[in-house]
Amino acid sequence: MTRRYWNINLKEMIEAGVHFGHGIKKWNPKMAPYISAKRKGTHITNLARTTRFLSEACDLVFDAASQGKSFLIVGTKKRAADLVASAAIRARCHYVNKKWFSGMLTNWSITKTRLSQFRDLRAEEKMEKFHHLPKRDVAILKRKLSTLLRYLGGIKYMTRLPDIVIVLDQQKEYIALRECAILGIPTISLADTNCDPDLANISIPANDDTMTSIRLILNKLVFAICEGRSLYIRNH
């Protein structure tokens, strides 16, 4: 794996609140190696460990992107939905930012069928084929299209399982992580002090509740993906 310098700045992480964990009563003992202190009843994440694992994650996604691999970013918190979509679009990644449907990856044949329905309905709407149908049927089809767009819009171009999955909230996206583990898909996950670092291939110790923290980590990963994609384009 290529090791590169990703300009991960300690001051920047402190300003973003990356180091703030959960209350000490909510912690997961498996996170002990990644905690540096307790402050006013709250665990403080060791940012040296954050820097190390974020660098490793950036190296991994850079190498994968430079080989033309595909990525899926998963973050279904309401506050993070727009951030996930904009970051994924910027790096040309697939994304899920509304709801993770159980079996989205493990029952890939069903997901592919839904995506096919979605693409067909979009094509019919653009070709104005709905105009020839009764109003009631048009309303039903438009409602179905709207639902498919809301939940599958971020993976509408996905034709196969992703090569790497990035998860922004381990506890909220537990099912997604389990599906990746079953399928052997490498995962990168933020790991707050109440998380289990063993659930992902690379767990980045970081605050997964504050938008500034999530944005900083995601931006570093997206930058590394974009750099890798640029290298892939130059070589092909």
From Swiss-Prot:
Superkingdom to which the source organism belongs: Eukaryota
SUPFAM superfamilies on file: Ribosomal protein S2 (SSF52313)
Main location: plastid
A single MF term (Gene Ontology): structural constituent of ribosome
Name of the protein in its database record: Small ribosomal subunit protein uS2c
GO CC term (a single one): mitochondrial small ribosomal subunit
Record HAMAP family: Ribosomal_uS2_B (MF_00291_B)
Classification via PANTHER family: 30S RIBOSOMAL PROTEIN S2 PROKARYOTIC AND ORGANELLAR, SMALL RIBOSOMAL SUBUNIT PROTEIN US2M
Biological process according to GO: translation
Pfam entry (one): Ribosomal_S2
Family: Belongs to the universal ribosomal protein uS2 family.
Keywords: Chloroplast, Plastid, Ribonucleoprotein, Ribosomal protein
Protein's cellular compartments: Plastid, Chloroplast
